[in-house]
Amino acid sequence: MKNINPTQTSAWQALQKHYDDMKDVTIADLFAKDSDRFTRFSATFDDLMLVDFSKNRITEETLAKLQDLAKETDLAGAIKSMFSGEKINRTEDRAVLHVALRNRSNTPIIVDGKDVMPEVNAVLEKMKAFSEAIISGQWKGYTGKAITDVVNIGIGGSDLGPFMVTEALRPYKNHLNMHFVSNVDGTHIAEVLKKVNPETTLFLVASKTFTTQETMTNAHSARDWFLSTANDEKHVAKHFAALSTNAKAVGEFGIDTANMFEFWDWVGGRYSLWSAIGLSIILSVGFDNFVELLSGAHAMDKHFSTTPAEKNLPVLLALIGIWYNNFFGAETEAILPYDQYMHRFAAYFQQGNMESNGKYVDRNGNAVDYQTGPIIWGEPGTNGQHAFYQLIHQGTKMVPCDFIAPAITHNPLSDHHQKLLSNFFAQTEALAFGKSREVVEQEYRDQGKDPSQLEHVVPFKVFEGNRPTNSILLREITPFSLGALIALYEHKIFTQGAILNIFTFDQWGVELGKQLANRILPELGDDKAISSHDSSTNGLINRYKAWRA
């Protein structure tokens, strides 16, 4: 990957001038001038997904200039580098190959002179055999009973992805009850343990190194709870499995290393649901549905790696995001799925985007003088409409939004889905076109009221509009289409990082807090006053000690 400051390209300078021309142009103007705007600014994927980006403050000239930026920063070369196994995560000297985990074409992918696909396929086969034994009831707990509950213990990428997917694919789930524990707050594990039976519970401990503080603290608490009933350490092997590469530590914990499922250093945590970390997904929906999830992602991988940038969906969405973040000063993006099963999707890509592109140092090691990753947030519709849409519609901040919905619901109860989708369609229309003062006044006249007598309220009912949105309409949320949707966002994030000249696949920002916590932890072991930190931290620790006494 090349190290190119995007602001030094001629395309960036052209975009800056173009912004001066576009900043006062409204979305309503753009639609008024072009009756075919939807056709020109939308695209389908596999007849399963429609991406409508017409309600954005862009023209064909905007997109052309953004494409020029992608060319000048060598996006095509960056894509090739990732897919070919080059070590593009240079700060950790690692390849970035989550795409290999879902490489259903099974074409060789070489890392350090070795094809990784045989090992990928071997772990998949091992997960298949293990999951089928659990799901079928063939696997028995220490009292001879079949497993009824699975508890995934992990944090970050070892939790967010599997939790999001198992929730999104609930219509496909089997009889096993799934639970996820991530927080080191003892409340999280305690509340889950209240719901499960040690005789019929399987724990998955998801930690590559088997040293992650939060995960191992929870794992040891789960083990202690289990042994308080089982009373024999040999029974741990029937109720615990590991998603890890540290065979020594796994064995010392009491887990049979035959039930340790590996992944590799070229699998980043926030891109790991496709790996052994996805074992909880397989246990929830079955191996065949997991393969469909992989296949959907692989289909998007092929689209991303082979489609020209002008028609490439992840690239288009990435470029539009850069346009708003760097030229309009939009600091956030909202992800708004109109599907209750997708209630963790925004949280998943909050990590996916902010941990990937939340960087202020470029690939040359210099502080950037432009915007990198946006703040990502969101909630399912229509809940969000009754919470924060007020700010999106009438606030002082521009918040570009992605609206996501399935055309076909898994729960066709009376007219629920039509009402849900009517809101989905209405919100993007309202955000784009707003409501003028004239329309507000006419509405009062239609009600037999004199607008001049209501001047005190009219301004508050005006909507400026011109708020940008993308609409992503899926035919139905299936394992395949969900896989494609996740990969769409993954590649959008990669594209933005490549163009913005940052390292997307490390996360050094999580380290300092962990180091300081490890230093502070021993200081909390007694009641002595602390004076080794700044006055604020000292004051907080000492008040904590006083109150806990």
From Swiss-Prot:
Q: Where is the active site?
A: 355, 386, 514
Q: Where in the cell is it found?
A: Cytoplasm
Q: What does this protein do?
A: Catalyzes the reversible isomerization of glucose-6-phosphate to fructose-6-phosphate.
Q: What class of enzyme is it?
A: isomerase
* Pathway entry: Carbohydrate biosynthesis; gluconeogenesis; Carbohydrate degradation; glycolysis; D-glyceraldehyde 3-phosphate and glycerone phosphate from D-glucose: step 2/4
Q: Which CDD domains match?
A: SIS_PGI_1, SIS_PGI_2
Its protein name is Glucose-6-phosphate isomerase
GO biological process: what's one of them? glucose 6-phosphate metabolic process
User: Which catalytic reaction applies to this protein?
Assistant: alpha-D-glucose 6-phosphate = beta-D-fructose 6-phosphate
- Gene Ontology CC annotations of this record: cytosol
Would the keyword Isomerase turn up in this protein's UniProt record?
yes
Q: Which UniProt keywords apply?
A: Cytoplasm, Gluconeogenesis, Glycolysis, Isomerase
Name a GO molecular-function annotation: glucose-6-phosphate isomerase activity
Q: Which family does it belong to?
A: Belongs to the GPI family.
The Enzyme Commission number assigned here is 5.3.1.9
Give the superkingdom in one word: Bacteria
- Locate the transmembrane regions by residue number: none
Q: Which PROSITE patterns match?
A: P_GLUCOSE_ISOMERASE_1, P_GLUCOSE_ISOMERASE_2, P_GLUCOSE_ISOMERASE_3
Question: Pfam families per the record?
Answer: PGI
